[in-house]
């Protein structure tokens, strides 16, 4: 896949960006370079390759050292909700904005 200068102009327009011609050319080069890299990665035969959770796991046996899931701060819900204009059953009440 490769983009053209008109594709870059359209994307910039959709993003509400104004790109100078040199910026547009640079973006075209960078994005097409990215797409080339993706195509090269897609072409690699990965049949039989086991997915890795961590890249170092391919060369050595690692055990992830995860910390215990413990609350590090006290529950200050009531104190935090004192300044709220409306609270119900421990939840902040906000105006409906989507019909």
From Swiss-Prot:
Source organism superkingdom: Bacteria
GO biological process terms on file: glutaminyl-tRNAGln biosynthesis via transamidation; regulation of translational fidelity; translation
A Pfam family of this chain: GatC
This protein's record includes keyword Lipoprotein: no
Subunit structure: Heterotrimer of A, B and C subunits.
Keywords linked to the UniProt accession: ATP-binding, Ligase, Nucleotide-binding, Protein biosynthesis
InterPro entries recorded: Asp/Glu-ADT_sf_sub_c, GatC
UniProt entry tagged with the keyword ATP-binding: yes
Family: Belongs to the GatC family.
E.C. code: 6.3.5.-
Record's function text: Allows the formation of correctly charged Asn-tRNA(Asn) or Gln-tRNA(Gln) through the transamidation of misacylated Asp-tRNA(Asn) or Glu-tRNA(Gln) in organisms which lack either or both of asparaginyl-tRNA or glutaminyl-tRNA synthetases. The reaction takes place in the presence of glutamine and ATP through an activated phospho-Asp-tRNA(Asn) or phospho-Glu-tRNA(Gln).
Known catalytic reactions: L-glutamyl-tRNA(Gln) + L-glutamine + ATP + H2O = L-glutaminyl-tRNA(Gln) + L-glutamate + ADP + phosphate + H(+); L-aspartyl-tRNA(Asn) + L-glutamine + ATP + H2O = L-asparaginyl-tRNA(Asn) + L-glutamate + ADP + phosphate + 2 H(+)
Organism annotation: Variovorax paradoxus (strain S110)
GO molecular function, one term: ATP binding
The protein's name in its UniProt record: Aspartyl/glutamyl-tRNA(Asn/Gln) amidotransferase subunit C
